[in-house]
């Protein structure tokens, strides 16, 4: 049996890291693997469970075919370890923290991937980004405009998951959507 690749994506501030953290235990109990991605920024700086590497280390890993998927966005490099192919072949469902901008390429490599778009209402997203304090109000407005463009441009089937409310509700909705008799159900 082949596992399912669950490709989570959403704008900065949508709560992807919070969702992954909150869903980690219930998904693990169901046999789902949550991938630790490789990123060229300190994991502490992003608040996610990521392996931080330098740009030179990332390039070395990429040349060595250590990634099943890799992309560049916002001045950073992101990689999904090639180990996911082994897990999928063993029948495990695998959840990755992906990129909206890389979805088309991911679908070419994994045509049956399950795309999950985590979103929030624009005003909620604005408030979350302001609370983080990393960007100016003008940069936040530009980010919100890009978010609307990205959402309109995504093609193919995808599950839209609203994280504007309580995180527990979002976790329950994700688990219900992944229902069935698979490893992640």
Swiss-Prot record:
The protein, known as: Ribose 1,5-bisphosphate phosphokinase PhnN
Record's catalysed reaction(s): alpha-D-ribose 1,5-bisphosphate + ATP = 5-phospho-alpha-D-ribose 1-diphosphate + ADP
EC number: 2.7.4.23
GO biological process: 5-phosphoribose 1-diphosphate biosynthetic process; organic phosphonate metabolic process
Residues at which ATP binds: 10-17
Top-level lineage group: Bacteria
Family, similarity comment: Belongs to the ribose 1,5-bisphosphokinase family.
InterPro entries (alphabetical): GK/Ca_channel_bsu, P-loop_NTPase, PhnN
Gene transcribed to yield this protein: phnN
Pathway recorded for this protein: Metabolic intermediate biosynthesis; 5-phospho-alpha-D-ribose 1-diphosphate biosynthesis; 5-phospho-alpha-D-ribose 1-diphosphate from D-ribose 5-phosphate (route II): step 3/3
Keywords: ATP-binding, Nucleotide-binding, Transferase
Enzyme class: transferase
Function: Catalyzes the phosphorylation of ribose 1,5-bisphosphate to 5-phospho-D-ribosyl alpha-1-diphosphate (PRPP).
A GO MF term: ATP binding
């Amino acid at each position: 049996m082949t596992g399912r690749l669950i490709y989570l994506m959403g704008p900065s501030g949508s709560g992807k890291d919070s969702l992954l953290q909150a869903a980690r235990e219930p998904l693990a109990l169901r046999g789902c693997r949550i991938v630790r991605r490789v990123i060229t920024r300190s994991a502490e700086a992003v608040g996610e469970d990521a392996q931080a590497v330098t740009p030179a280390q990332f390039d070395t890993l990429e040349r060595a075919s250590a990634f099943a998927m890799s992309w560049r966005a916002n001045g950073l490099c992101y990689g999904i370890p090639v180990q996911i192919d082994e897990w999928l072949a063993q029948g495990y469902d695998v959840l990755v923290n992906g990129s909206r901008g890389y979805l088309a390429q991911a679908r070419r490599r994994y045509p049956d991937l399950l795309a999950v778009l985590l979103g929030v209402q624009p005003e909620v997203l604005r408030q979350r980004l302001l609370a983080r304090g990393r960007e100016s109000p003008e940069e936040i407005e530009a980010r919100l405009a890009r978010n609307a463009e990205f959402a309109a441009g995504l093609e193919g089937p995808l599950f839209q998951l609203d994280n504007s409310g309580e995180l527990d509700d979002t976790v329950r909705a994700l688990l219900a959507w992944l229902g069935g008799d698979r490893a992640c159900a």
